[in-house]
A protein has these predicted regions:
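A short, N-terminal "cap"/entry segment at the start of jelly-roll beta-barrel domains
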Residues: 1-54
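Conserved hydrophobic/aromatic beta-strand scaffold that supports enzyme active sites
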Residues: 44-46, 57-59, 78, 100-102, ...
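Short acidic-glycine-tyrosine-enriched beta hairpin
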Residues: 51, 89-108
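Short, charged/polar surface micro-motifs in flexible loops or helix N-caps
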Residues: 52-54, 63-66, 85, 107-108
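Short histidine-centered beta-strand/loop micro-motifs
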Residues: 58-60, 68-73, 90-93, 112-115
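Residue-level recognition of well-ordered beta-strand positions that form the cores
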Residues: 59-61, 85, 126
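Glycine- and acidic-residue-biased ligand/ion/polar-headgroup-sensing regions
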Residues: 63-64, 73-90
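Ligand-binding loop in jelly-roll beta-barrel domains
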Residues: 95-96, 105-132
Length: 132
């Protein structure tokens, strides 16, 4: 995707100067190659990054029993569970395939793939803003 440089703040208001390209990410969920190590037993595949807001979209994969450290989101988070079971230690629900979650900005939590998950968990996360 080309980078467009503007001479002034109002240049970007001209619809003819805006980028209209689409971006398509092939996540290849069953391929071992494109996964980035994140924590013990946890990997992610980046789908896109918003360099303006710090937001990002990723597919997270975790083995049963794997856990991320407690973390904090400065913006909202949406998650959709495609495979496996997972939860936050700070809540009493368990996400299973088909579960959609919404997190308000400012929540701190600890993600855990449940020990009894029948397979590695695959979750699509769309994060607005940074992760601390």
């Amino acid at each position: 995707m080309p980078i467009i440089a503007f001479n002034s703040a109002t240049d970007g208001l001209d619809p003819s100067r805006r980028s209209r390209g689409h971006f398509v990410a092939d996540t290849r969920l069953d391929d071992d190659g494109p996964w980035v190590p994140y924590a013990e037993g946890v990997w992610f595949q980046p789908c896109c990054f918003n360099v303006t807001s710090g937001g990002f979209s990723v597919v997270l994969k975790g083995l049963p029993g794997a856990q991320l450290g407690v973390h904090y989101h400065v913006g909202t988070v949406r998650g959709y569970t495609m495979r496996g079971h997972w939860r936050y230690l700070e809540h009493d629900w368990v996400a299973k395939p088909g579960t959609f979650i919404y997190e308000p900005a400012g929540e701190a939590h600890t993600l855990v793939i449940t020990d009894d998950s029948p397979e590695p968990a695959l979750i699509l996360f769309i994060v607005e803003g940074g992760l601390i």
